[in-house]
Amino acid sequence: AAVLLENGTIVLGNNQENVAYPSGMCAERTALFYAGAAYPDVPVKALAIAACFKGRPRKEVVSPCGACRQVMAEVIRRYGRDFDVLMIGEEETVVIKASSLLPFSFEYTG
């Protein structure tokens, strides 16, 4: 995954696997969390997601899991702006707004 920030910085992330499943983390969250830690005041402009299998790009587009979608919803709330998500496959790329991936996200109301 790659996060493009509003200032032009690109932050990369990859899957972090762990034998103590489900302790690993998806590439999307790795990149978004790193961007939030390293550039806390810079909004996200876009997030690109791609995957390979045995060194080759997947033919199908890659869609984020529910946990990643929730994190995206919280990034939108944090900065007050939506961002593009590019789901990349070998044969096509789908571009969609992050807000449309999880229309009924959890929200802290405490």
Regions found by a protein language model. Give the residues of each.
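C-terminal binding/interaction regions
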Residues: 39-110
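Hydrophobic "anchor" residues
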Residues: 9-10
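A short mixed-secondary-structure module that forms the rim of ligand-binding clefts
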Residues: 18-37
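A short glycine/serine-rich beta->alpha loop
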Residues: 14-22, 54-59
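Short beta-strand scaffold segments in enzyme catalytic cores
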Residues: 1-5
